[in-house]
Amino acid sequence: MSRIGRLPIPVPKGVSVEVAPGRVKVKGPKGELEVPVSPEMRVVVEEGVVRVERPSDERRHKSLHGLTRTLIANAVKGVSEGYSKELLIKGIGYRARLVGRALELTVGFSHPVVVEPPEGITFEVPEPTRVRVSGIDKQKVGQVAANIRAIRKPSAYHEKGIYYAGEPVRLKPGKAGAKK
């Protein structure tokens, strides 16, 4: 059995899980998510626990088993607690601000870059150099954060760009200089 797939998913109070053919609906205090499930996987909802069972030990079924369990667990955590990613903006004159729901970034271009949040995603700017991307869908939060980071990736030679909070700053050494 898949080590991850066989773990039961605890369902917190206030969260309901419904199983339908080909999908699992998860509802909670923060919202509702629908997870597509392979028809070969069997999802069982017991009191306070969700289990995923696979039909055989084929390689394909083993990989689907762990994937399905993780996607459902992410949905359960998302509707109960939510997900967020924090980005740091470093550089002279680099900053962010909210314009309505949209995020406006001034990151060294001749124009400000405006990022509209997709449905289910919110931006927070606690400081001009910090941006928090929040939502209930882990994949969407990560993708939006990656898209923002891609606007001005961290520079390898200068400590400027958009970083994930906690991301190590890897700087290359500059030119060694001429030897005399």
UniProtKB/Swiss-Prot annotation:
Disulfide bonds: none annotated. The keyword Zinc-finger does not apply. The keyword Ribonucleoprotein applies. One of its GO terms (cellular component) is cytosolic large ribosomal subunit. One of its GO terms (biological process) is cytoplasmic translation. One of its GO terms (molecular function) is structural constituent of ribosome. SUPFAM superfamilies: Ribosomal protein L6. Keywords: Ribonucleoprotein, Ribosomal protein, RNA-binding, rRNA-binding. InterPro entries: Ribosomal_uL6-like, Ribosomal_uL6-like_a/b-dom_sf, Ribosomal_uL6_a/b-dom, Ribosomal_uL6_bac-type. Belongs to the universal ribosomal protein uL6 family. This protein binds to the 23S rRNA, and is important in its secondary structure. It is located near the subunit interface in the base of the L7/L12 stalk, and near the tRNA binding site of the peptidyltransferase center. NCBIfam families: L6_bact. Part of the 50S ribosomal subunit. This is Large ribosomal subunit protein uL6. It comes from Thermus thermophilus (strain ATCC BAA-163 / DSM 7039 / HB27).
